[in-house]
Amino acid sequence: DCTQQNGNQGKRIEAHAFQPLANGHIMIAESGAGRIIEIDRNGKIHHQIQLKIRQPHPHRDTRLARKLPNGNYLVCHEGDGAVREYEGKTGEVVWEYDIPLFGKERRGGHGPEAFGNQVFGAVRLPNGNTLIATGNGHSVLEVTPAKKIVWKIEQKDLSGITLAWVTTLEVLPNGNYIIGNCH
């Protein structure tokens, strides 16, 4: 229980991302503590970095996070509406992308009528671009390292499907995408 160990006693903590690592450790993104930790199977912390969070909240600090092959971390910050890449040893932000609103007004809620930039998931592609599930932005964006959108799919672009809260992303071996869509 992340609220009872590793310095989190008495804090409201939510863990939104876990990743088993090749060395046998587990990466965990802790919202509330605002950090990424790598622990062994006994819960001992072997590495940690603090995250840059503009609008701290234990439910919205992070969503999906992944350790990249280069050792850095790619982290979605739902409350900040941003995806950040952190240098794996120092925690320095080395890349950041703020999810655009595309000139639209924010609308509360969780369904297709809501709108915002509460980003949920991101995947680093083999070409170096980042595929981003924009949460209540109802879209998936492919963004270059220079932050240029080179591909996107929006709320009503798929026949018979309305994108609402776009969450998870997976790139299949054949290059196709699996897109999580809920609410």
Which residues fall in each region the model found?
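Histidine-/acidic-rich catalytic cores in large beta-rich domains
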Residues: 1-183
